[in-house]
Amino acid sequence: MIIQAKVINVSQTVTGKSATTGKDWANKGILLGWEDEDGEQFIRAQVAENIWHEYALQVSDVGCIALRFRTIQSRKSNYVYNDIRIVPLPNRQ
């Protein structure tokens, strides 16, 4: 899904190591906002630091952003949650 949104806030980078793959990761939390027929809308998404760098957007910038949604169930707690990620924009030729 691609949306046109304003960057409201960008969190500090959080780092860790994947328990599944053993790979290091570095993510940021991004708060995005836009207006539609129902008024102001907001969504918080995670993004890998290197992907966010490719977008080159700063707080208050408006741009096209690609989002991926998936539902995940925790193996430990059986808790179900939605994972919203900012992903690279598809190549448009």
Spans of features found by a protein language model:
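Single-stranded nucleic acid-binding surfaces, predominantly the OB-fold ssDNA-binding core
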Residues: 1-93
